[in-house]
Amino acid sequence: MTRRYWNINLEEMMEAGVHFGHGTRKWNPKMAPYISAKRKGIHITNLTRTARFLSEACDLVFDAASRGKQFLIVGTKNKAADSVEWAAIRARCHYVNKKWLGGMLTNWSTTETRLHKFRDLRMEQKTGRLNRLPKRDAAMLKRQLSRLQTYLGGIKYMTGVPDIVIIVDQHEEYTALRECITLGIPTIYLTDTNCDPDLADISIPANDDAISSIRLILNKLVFAICEGRSSYIRNP
């Protein structure tokens, strides 16, 4: 895999608060190699290492995108939801930003059935068929459609399990992470100082609580994916 330059700037990461970890009492000892200091009771992440692993992640997603691979971005906590949706839409990725439904990947046949139902209901709404049903039936189906839109709207065009999954918060998305591990799907995630860096294929040491940090990391990954997709379009 060819290494590329992704304009990862340490000062920019500091301004975004990427280096701020959790309180020193809430840390995972496995993160010791990625911590450079303690300041006012919190751990400080070594941004040089962050830059290294973020660059590796960008290389990986560029290479995958240039070969037409599919990505899923997962981040369901309120702070991350908008950034996840923005990043996914920009890079034409699938995303989950409301709630991870258990078995979404490991029980793909059930997810596929739900997606078929979702598409059918969307078509019925688009054609006006729902409005021609009795009010009670129409109301029930509209509630069902709204629920499916909330939880599956970001994966409505997904036709199979993704090739790479990007996860914003290890603890919040642990079920999604375990499903990826079970299926052998490569994962990239932000690794705060209270996380286990050994569970992902590429762990990016970074603050997974600050919106500015999440947005910066996703922005770099999304740029690499877009560049890779452009390469794929030029050289199919």
UniProtKB/Swiss-Prot annotation:
Any one of the GO BP annotations: translation
Compartments, as annotated in UniProt: Plastid, Chloroplast
Keyword Chloroplast found: yes
Entry annotated with the keyword Nucleotide-binding: no
InterPro entries: Ribosomal_uS2 (IPR001865), Ribosomal_uS2_bac/mit/plastid (IPR005706), Ribosomal_uS2_CS (IPR018130), Ribosomal_uS2_flav_dom_sf (IPR023591)
Alphabetized Pfam families for the sequence: Ribosomal_S2 (PF00318)
GO cellular component: chloroplast; mitochondrial small ribosomal subunit
Keywords for this protein: Chloroplast, Plastid, Ribonucleoprotein, Ribosomal protein
Coiled coil regions, renumbered to chain: none
Gene3D superfamilies, A to Z: Glucose-6-phosphate isomerase like protein, domain 1, Helix hairpin bin
A single GO molecular function term of this UniProt record: structural constituent of ribosome
Principal place of residence: plastid
PANTHER family for the chain: 30S RIBOSOMAL PROTEIN S2 PROKARYOTIC AND ORGANELLAR, SMALL RIBOSOMAL SUBUNIT PROTEIN US2M
Similarity annotation: Belongs to the universal ribosomal protein uS2 family.
Protein name (database record): Small ribosomal subunit protein uS2c
Gene encoding the protein: rps2
